[in-house]
Amino acid sequence: SMDHENEIIIYTHIGDNWMIESDANGWETYSELPRQRFEHQYFDDTNLIKNMVFDLQVPTIGAMPGPGFHWDSAMLCDVTICTEDTKIEVPHAQGGLVPGDGMGLMFQHYLGTKKGNYYMMTTRQVTAPQMLEWGLVSEVVPKGKAVERAWEIARMWKRMPYENRCIMSNLAKRPLMKLFMEDLKLHTVSEQYASLLRVAEGTLGDENSAQQDEKYISRVNDYRYATKDMEQPMNFELWDGMPKRAGEWFKKVESGEIENPYVFEHSNEPDWYNAF
């Protein structure tokens, strides 16, 4: 944001997907509780989201090349493009957590209160056609064309006077600015407080959770995005059996029976994964 030679920003991800390859060790850098978790969630997470809207004074285009989690950063751009295979979700509740890191707030904002609450609280996935119909994205394009389309739009905007396209971008960001001023901090603190309660109880990552102390989520995410299980209305059987099905699915991957399209080095899964 401080580099004034940046005139238009395309926000995307390397490869065919959107930030789907989890780092099994990624949480170790701030796993000390409670100070580092507080600093990460209360300061870093909140500011990362706010900076996308308040600090970037030039037009922004989110280009999603495929499915993945923490899609909220792409939705914070002035215009968002996704490919036809993209799907998104707010998975927190199924892992026993509160969805307060921005994704739940985005669902409420773009889908409306009732529909947003439903998809947030049941963890059901939203597909690309639904994302377009419900106003989460601006366009849906064929696989491999998201960045190409983003560049085309950027070249169009480049024809405008610099000052005018910056002012236009400010107007585009206004609804999210007002939303974040009212609710973002409350959402962030709510997830943080609920997580710390589970840590204090010793239940974060228990046998009823899809999430094992936050650094073991890689395999579960791969399963959720590689199958269509999460696209259908959730029932108790689907909800309760998801961790077990993820383990069974990955055993088939390891045996070569099926292919994991989201290959990543999963080195730190807990022992209970291997029991299925």
Where are these regions (language model features)?
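C-terminal alpha-helix plus adjacent terminal tail
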Residues: M2-E5, H13-I20, N25-G26, T123, ...
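Short, high-confidence coil segments that cap the C-terminus of an alpha-helix
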Residues: H4-E7, C77
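Hydrophobic/aromatic residues within transmembrane alpha-helices
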Residues: Y11, D23, P59, S73-M75, ...
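Extended, non-globular alpha-helical segments
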Residues: W18-M19, A24-M52
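Glycine-rich beta-to-alpha active-site loop
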Residues: N47-G95, Q125
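Alpha-helical segments flanking ligand/cofactor-binding loops in enzyme cores
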Residues: N51, W71-D72, L105, N117, ...
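Short acidic-hydrophobic, aromatic-tinged amphipathic segments that line or gate anion-handling sites
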Residues: I81-C82, V137-R149
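Hydrophobic, secondary-structure "cap" segments at the distal end of domains
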Residues: G104-K114
